[in-house]
Regions:
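Terminal low-complexity/charged segments
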Residues: 1-155
Length: 155
């Protein structure tokens, strides 16, 4: 199914912007499970999910889909640190949900478990949240364990 038809079904085509790299739309309060189910039934392929902190203290999540060769990017905002999981509908979302949990301590509701992906077992989720508070000069890949230990000692 083509991207424009999907946007029409979501009733967001008027807010969507077509760019050289695909269709982009922001959907506040997105029902991600409803979206994932619609995409599954319409045979639109899940590509990935990206997440970044937003300026209001929440997170911006972008669900990327391949609709007959056109990239469809549907963004939403998470303010409370949790959002519904789509991994049971789209197993390919499993790793990226685990990655976002490790990096930002996001909770994906509905998962039976969320094992670590980038962190070691027993490490606290939220690697980027912790290290960004310590300053930009810290390399999270190298010093995450040291930053977490220093934070524990200060508490």
């Amino acid at each position: 199914m083509d991207a424009e038809s999907i946007l029409h079904m979501l009733d967001v085509e008027s807010a969507a912007e077509h760019r050289t790299d695909g269709w982009w739309v922001d959907v506040p309060d997105l029902d991600v499970r409803g979206l994932a189910t619609l995409m599954r039934t319409r045979e639109v392929r899940f590509v990935t999910l990206t997440g970044t902190p937003d300026t209001a203290g929440g997170y911006r999540l972008i669900y990327h889909w391949d609709a007959d060769g056109a990239l469809l990017n549907i963004a939403t905002t998470v303010s409370a640190g949790c959002i519904a999981s789509i991994a049971d509908i789209w197993p390919a979302a499993d790793w990226v949900e685990r990655e976002l949990r490790d990096y930002y301590a996001l909770v994906f509701e509905g998962r039976a478990e969320t094992p670590t992906l980038m962190l070691l077992e027993g490490d606290e989720p939220g690697l980027f949240s912790r290290t960004s508070a310590a300053g930009r000069e810290i390399d999270p890949a190298v010093t995450a364990r040291d930053a977490a230990e220093a934070e524990r000692k200060e508490s």
